Amino acid sequence: MNLSAPPARRPIFALGLLATALAASFSANAQTSSVRGGVTSLEEIRVLPSAKEAVKQAPGVSTITAKDIEKRPPANDLSELIRTMPGVNLTGNSPSGSYGNSRQIDLRGMGPENTLILIDGKPVSSRDSIRMGRDGERNTRGDSNWVPVNAIERIEVLRGPAASRYGSGAAGGVVNIITKAPTDTFSGSVTAYGLIPEDSNYGSTRRTGFNLSGPIADKLSFRVYGNIAKTDADKPALNSQASGMEVNETTVPPAGREGVRNKDINGLVRLDINRDHRLELEGSFSRQGNIYAGERLFSRSTSTIASLAEEGAETNIMYRRAGSLSHYGDYGQGRTSRLTFAYEGTTNSRLNEGLAGSVEGSISNPGAGSVSELRSLNISGEYNTPLQIADKHVLMTVGFEHRDQSLDDDYATRSGQSINNNTDSKSKARTTAAFVEGNIELTEALTVTPGVRFDHHSKFGDNWSPSLNASYFITDNITLKGGIARAFKAPNLYQSNPNYLYQTRGNGCPYDPVTGQRVSGPCYIFGNDNLSPERSINKEIGLAYDNAGWAAGLTYFQNDYSNKIVADMGDQTIPDAVYIGGSLVRPFQWVNSGKAVIRGLEGNLTIPILGENGDTLSLSNNLTYMITNKSKETNQPLTVIPRYTLNSTLDWRVNDRLSMLATATLYGKQKPRSHNLSNNSEVKGDGLRERGSYAIFGLSGAYQVTKSTNIRLGVNNLFDKRLYREDSGSGQGANTYNEPGRQYYATLTASF
């Protein structure tokens, strides 16, 4: 049933937003008056952190600083570093293993589609321009590679209840990439990075980036950064031995990691109107082009695939254009505001990948391509004001967000067939939201942060996302923290478009669970505009200790996940054949599935060994342990992730100029699915093979050559532990990706 609000309700919702804004304005005025209605004058109020800042102290929040990035520079994609945080894995969006080397950021096992990527608080959605296949996967690198390493101030990773204020797509969590701000004095830096693998079958990386900022005139300053990078593709023969497939004119083994060429430029101008108000105007352009390595959805190879892989052809190009205008206000005594208008446009140009049968996800014609266009408009704002209610200190936040998103993908609807005889290639969605949250100091030891967000979606109606986080100081050094929140994700523009179609003549049709026989084709799988949003109740509770360089913590988390959107391939029902476009076919659709549960533990331990608070030598560890991650309906995993992940870092500052870093990451066993949801069949043989536990070690050192010049040399995968991909289809089990062998890297930064 379509839950969109009737026209009569829309003015009511608009009035609700207006009332919220007026309430914020009233509270701002009331704070300068005398005691009235339980609200005392602002002069008596002690300003607390905002709710947004308070939840960053929750157990499920981690921060990667610019210094951390310098110590462990990623080769190209930020996901390489973000994966070292607790609760973070790199995986696909389903247990299928499709496009296994294009892994994305997965927070607490909820899948990449439930990880919201932000740049300076603004949503990034370029991956949404890429077609979603029936197994729930996209052939994409994700959205973690639009900002060059040298431009980052810090990265905030919010997992669980702390992320609920961000709305749709943040059920797993949020990754917020914060860039460097303009400086008061003219300054800049240039960074060059190179990575060379010991085995030439693996791709190498070169990148150069710059960062420049300073004043233009009185009250006017700027910041600009740019980046050029290239990571070569793995050789087509890399997985030959593991898969038993040789490279020839018509055959290529399961693909290794594809390469990528990056070009990024970003500029920001800041106008300080006065001491309390400023405007920021920002614009950016990025180009990402792949270097093809032979990737396809199934194991079938063709002469076209083999030729493109051998050539290292550029088979898809992503162009991203973004711009924003923001106002920041400080009205004194803790009252602040922000208003942002942001635009993002993505052009996805690629060689056509099959939409039918065994050629689904495979390139068959190197001369045939298509373009999809995704445009997003985001308007958001918030107002923070301190209050004192019933003798309690409160920092109240009210805010709103409006998102408009439109997608035009002619190729995905090119079959000319649809359930409703409408083959429009365009789809749109609009979301309007308001939220209110407060940081309340109930006692000197107990702080609670309640909040609620209301979203109205143009297709799927209303959604409420209440949340409650709390922090209690048992002692000055021991804190008990917890939270609970309701999160959601609206169907994406492919899942909800009834004109989006995958078709198969018969071999891709599902098996009937009653007869055990494959359903006779052809079969069509359509988008569905009658879906419900995915929902999750996220809970966590943790204990933390922090004293004189020692830090320890243990957190239990649980996500009760429901309504996950999947392509119904006979698991729920086998539809009767109907006539569509003059042909008798079986119409399947995207549907909401049943309940799932994710439970796990996150822990951390930092040990100061030498120096004050360990500033000379320290050992830092974090652990993620997955207790369960499965559908209650099918008993299948939601994603293929390690049972546990342990990250350890030994950080030694030898002297003022020299420092050393040793790292170790241990991954637990990974189990594959036992049931193939894409055709409703049981997985057998090699498809049930697990990936055993393994460990990766690294070593690096940095030397401050001069005050403005720094060099770092390092070795990744010190003991040369290599993992291979055994198949491109369901026969690979959990062996869905490559772990590259030993690599040597160097990075040089010159600043002024």
Task: Enumerate the predicted regions with their spans.
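Extracytoplasmic beta-strand/coil segments of soluble accessory domains associated
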Residues: 33, 79-127
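Gram-negative outer-membrane beta-barrel transporters
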Residues: 35, 191, 441-443, 552-561, ...
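Transmembrane beta-barrel wall of Gram-negative outer-membrane proteins
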Residues: 201-293, 319-324, 390
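N-terminal periplasmic accessory domains that precede
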Residues: 78-81, 103-106, 118-120, 142-145, ...
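Short acidic/polar hinge/loop motifs at secondary-structure boundaries
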Residues: 123-159
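C-terminal beta-signal and adjacent terminal beta-strands/loops
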Residues: 127-130, 562, 567, 666-678, ...
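Short, acidic, small-residue-rich periplasmic hinge/interaction motif at the N-terminus
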Residues: 31-71, 120, 330
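Outer-membrane beta-barrel signature, preferentially recognizing the C-terminal barrel domain
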Residues: 304-327, 427-429, 479, 483-561, ...
